[in-house]
């Protein structure tokens, strides 16, 4: 019973974690990718 309850909790946490990642990814890409591209472009030039 304990192992089953733990597996159920982890599966729910995984779904919740993935949903949060999907929500955060677009924002992180806009915040981090653009500055990285600008810095890398200016550094290469």
Swiss-Prot record:
Reaction catalysed by this enzyme: Endohydrolysis of the N-glycosidic bond at one specific adenosine on the 28S rRNA
Keyword annotations: Hydrolase, Plant defense, Protein synthesis inhibitor, Toxin
Gene Ontology molecular function, alphabetical: rRNA N-glycosylase activity; toxin activity
Biological process, per Gene Ontology: defense response; negative regulation of translation
InterPro entries: Ribosome-inact_prot_sf
EC numbers: 3.2.2.22
Family: Belongs to the ribosome-inactivating protein family. Type 1 RIP subfamily.
Function: Capable of inhibiting HIV-1 infection and replication. It inactivates eukaryotic 60S ribosomal subunits.
Listed name of the protein: Ribosome-inactivating protein TAP-29
Organism name: Trichosanthes kirilowii
């Amino acid at each position: 019973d304990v192992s089953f309850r733990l597996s159920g909790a982890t599966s729910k946490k995984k779904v919740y974690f993935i949903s949060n990642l999907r929500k955060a990814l677009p924002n992180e890409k806009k915040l981090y990718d653009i500055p990285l591209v600008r810095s890398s472009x200016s550094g290469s030039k």
